[in-house]
Design a protein with these regions (language model features):
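Intrinsically disordered, low-complexity Ser/Thr/Pro/Gly-rich regulatory segments
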Residues: 1-34, 38-192
Length: 192
């Protein structure tokens, strides 16, 4: 789990009150994994969260530019590319991992039809990210529409998590650092 996935995992645990499972391998998925799966016991909501974060603003995508990433990560399409030998890439073979993704959901007890898909990115170009962004995504290869929630790590997840963590979390280095940063900001504001 990389740092941004760790932050998102902590957000779903501490802010949303979910149990989480990170880096779940897709069953027979040829090096595919689901970044974070989360489950909220009271509401019985099941989440599949994918994290695509870069903090350089010029690399941040618009909602339209995120579509191929949704199709690959949530719905198992293979990215369009050509192999050195014609017909050898998953794309050229027309391979889809959708059935393996749904099998993986079922393997952890999720109903594939009820999974809430969440994409986390640094920011979405051209959109205010201070609250969740809900979009309807049409998957061409599945011929249906799915709701996807997009969260800005910079504008939504980090502030929510910093408000929740306080100054404890001694066993989690990443959360401890976020706690230090929050306290620095609070104490610096008092001095100014």
């Amino acid at each position: 789990m990389n740092a941004s996935e760790h932050i998102v995992d902590a957000y779903f645990r501490l802010v949303r009150g979910c149990f989480t499972l990170a880096d779940k391998k897709v069953i027979k998925g040829n090096n595919r994994q689901l970044d974070v799966l989360a489950y909220h016991l009271k509401s019985r909501e099941a989440f599949h969260i994918e994290v695509g974060v870069t903090h350089q603003q010029n690399w941040c995508l618009s909602i339209e530019e995120l579509a191929p990433h949704f199709d690959k990560k949530f719905f198992g399409t293979s990215p369009e590319r050509k192999g050195a030998v014609d017909g050898m890439t998953d794309f050229e073979k027309g391979k889809s991992y959708w059935s393996k993704i749904t099998e993986t959901y079922e393997n952890v007890g999720f109903n594939p039809e009820e999974v809430i898909r969440v994409w986390v990115t640094w920011i979405v170009r051209g959109v205010d990210g201070r609250s969740p962004i809900n979009v309807e995504f049409y998957s061409n290869h599945l011929n249906r529409t799915f709701p996807i929630q997009i969260l800005s790590l910079r504008d939504y997840v980090l502030p929510q998590l910093q408000n929740e963590i306080g100054t404890a979390n001694y066993d989690d280095e990443l959360l401890r650092v976020l706690g230090f940063v929050k306290q620095r900001e609070l104490q610096s504001a008092m001095i100014s």
